[in-house]
Amino acid sequence: MNSKNYHQKKRFGQHWLVNKKILEKIKEIAVLNENDFILEIGPGKGALTSKLLNSEIKKLHAIELDKDLINLLNDKFNNNDKFSLQQGDILSVNLDSINKKITKVIANIPYNITGPILDIFIGRLGIIRKYNYEKIIFLMQKDVVDRILSKEGSPNAGALSIRMQLLSKIKRICDVPPSSFSPPPKVFSSLVVFEPIKNDLRLDISLEKYIDKLLRISFNSRRKMLRNTLNTILSNEEINELSESSKVCFNLRPQDISIDQWIKLAENCIKIKK
């Protein structure tokens, strides 16, 4: 198939990056080397794929959902030994055979699957992470990145920002206007780099699970004070004890609690409940 004859499908949320400066920027921040095994999600017509393959990398494995693009991509890159292609849905495809080989993940994420993609590649609290990614580069919806980077006290702060910041170091590289895509989306995007935190000595899986439990309970009623949300799992006596031992005011709302305070709350809550 000739790429000029291909028409994008709305159901796949296809907005292809055409801004050459941003394509080059992605390659630049990836800091590629001869040992890199790249996973590219949704290569589209291969604009970014081509740039990545022209770098000193070991392998690029691309996963594309749209069957009509498979032949186009194979025709374009079939003679490149570093390239492999798999047709499938990234939300359900089995990556076990290559997961431990992948060093970097790069994707222009369809807005409608941002949450599940973050769960798969950044991870979830309390779930053992079965990967060794050095760097994850996502082009994603700007307002989601705004939420992810929010600190305590911000109206955007929430369970998502705390989870993502506990699991990775995050850096926004730049914002990307709709005109950088074809067709243009209705909103701005942001180019962001996640570096998974592999060995956070403060946390273990059981503590992560408890932090996640506290976050779910608290942010389900984010307008309420902690005292009035955690009373579903703690008695008034336990709440007072936890407030004192953690040095956290329970008259605050969850978005006003720092990450270190959530860790301390979970640690002391576990002690109280033993």
Swiss-Prot record:
It holds the Pfam family RrnaAD. InterPro entries: KsgA/Erm, rRNA_Ade_diMease-like_C, rRNA_Ade_Mease_Trfase_CS, rRNA_Ade_methylase_Trfase_N, rRNA_adenine_dimethylase, SAM-dependent_MTases_sf. It catalyses: adenosine(1518)/adenosine(1519) in 16S rRNA + 4 S-adenosyl-L-methionine = N(6)-dimethyladenosine(1518)/N(6)-dimethyladenosine(1519) in 16S rRNA + 4 S-adenosyl-L-homocysteine + 4 H(+). It is an enzyme of class 2 (transferase). Keywords: Cytoplasm, Methyltransferase, RNA-binding, rRNA processing, S-adenosyl-L-methionine, Transferase. One of its GO terms (molecular function) is RNA binding. It is found in: Cytoplasm. GO terms for cellular component: cytosol. The keyword Methyltransferase applies. PROSITE patterns: RRNA_A_DIMETH, SAM_RNA_A_N6_MT. SMART domains: rADc. Its EC number is 2.1.1.182. Belongs to the class I-like SAM-binding methyltransferase superfamily. rRNA adenine N(6)-methyltransferase family. RsmA subfamily. Specifically dimethylates two adjacent adenosines (A1518 and A1519) in the loop of a conserved hairpin near the 3'-end of 16S rRNA in the 30S particle. May play a critical role in biogenesis of 30S subunits. HAMAP family: 16SrRNA_methyltr_A. PANTHER family: DIMETHYLADENOSINE TRANSFERASE (PTHR11727), DIMETHYLADENOSINE TRANSFERASE-RELATED (PTHR11727:SF7). This is Ribosomal RNA small subunit methyltransferase A. It comes from Prochlorococcus marinus (strain MIT 9301).
